[in-house]
Amino acid sequence: MFKRTVILLAGPTGSGKTAVSLKLAPLVDGEIISVDSMQVYQGMDIGTAKVSLTDRKEVPHHLIDVCHVQESFNAVDFYYHAVQACQDILSRNKVPILVGGTGFYFHTFLSGPPSGPSPDFVLREQLTLEAQERGISALYQELELLDPVYAATITKHDKNKIIRALEIIRKTGSKVSSYAWQSTVNESKEYHCRRWLLSPDPELLRHNILERCDQMLEEGLLDEVQALLAAGIKGNSSASRAIGYREWIEFLDLGSPPDLFEITKQKFITNTWRYTKKQRTWFKRYSLFRELRPMGMTLDDMAKKIAQDYFLCG
């Protein structure tokens, strides 16, 4: 089977992957697919370092602002959205460039989502009627009792996912969370993937993170968190626990005490750095990503290197 080529550009927070991708896209006539578990949410802009609207006009981006903060979005959702975006981009003879730092999403894109039982439309209809009669909150409470692990990954507003989960449980007697993911990353069955990992020196990465956190606060992160609280972000456990949001949600809930500002800021920086180290560990676990060390290279240099590889192998 002939496979179309796509580019994967991964890296930890603060590695410069967004800046490189904006240089790369014009070189290969590409469009960018965000591989970030939080950039899918509307209103989570500053804290997720979303690319600016100006840059999005220059280079089309996909999988940004696709859902409300009260909705859940997981790796399975990402897989189907990303495949659809790839097909759309390729149909216009453009090059998909998947860019981000959510390793599990890259894993899912390469290996596919976990398998599950086939749909039972009769049972689904019964559950839909139950939702109308009892309310979707009652079904969510039932799911929390039967499969608390999976229930914690969605919200009480996710009607379709709640019904599908209960459908699986009632049909098979097994928890949704028991369906295992692939433990290894494989070659995508759909695409020929050129995989790159930006891997800056740890000291440079730490410096970038310090600057990044300061810049987010200067750009109005606290105002953004306040707006998200009004929009109901607490109804989504994943979004409200995201680094850069959970620290400041707690700060605002306490009444924004001035004496806790610096403590909260340091917690924000520390948590970001810890997450970055986890990202680096995750990506280096898989030899399928080719490391690109920025030392001595400009953004243009890195973009050209990836583009040359694409044209040689694409």
UniProtKB/Swiss-Prot annotation:
Q: Which cofactor does it need?
A: Mg(2+)
* Residues binding ATP, per UniProt: G11, P12, T13, G14, S15, G16, K17, T18
Positions of region (Interaction with substrate tRNA): 36-39
Metal-binding found in the keyword field: no
Keyword field: ATP-binding, Magnesium, Nucleotide-binding, Transferase, tRNA processing
- Catalysed conversion reaction: adenosine(37) in tRNA + dimethylallyl diphosphate = N(6)-dimethylallyladenosine(37) in tRNA + diphosphate
Protein origin, superkingdom: Bacteria
The EC number on file is 2.5.1.75
Which residues bear the site annotation Interaction with substrate tRNA? T102, R124
Query: A single GO molecular function, which one?
Result: tRNA dimethylallyltransferase activity
Of which family is this protein a member? Answer: Belongs to the IPP transferase family.
What name is this protein filed under?
tRNA dimethylallyltransferase
Q: Name the gene for this chain.
A: miaA
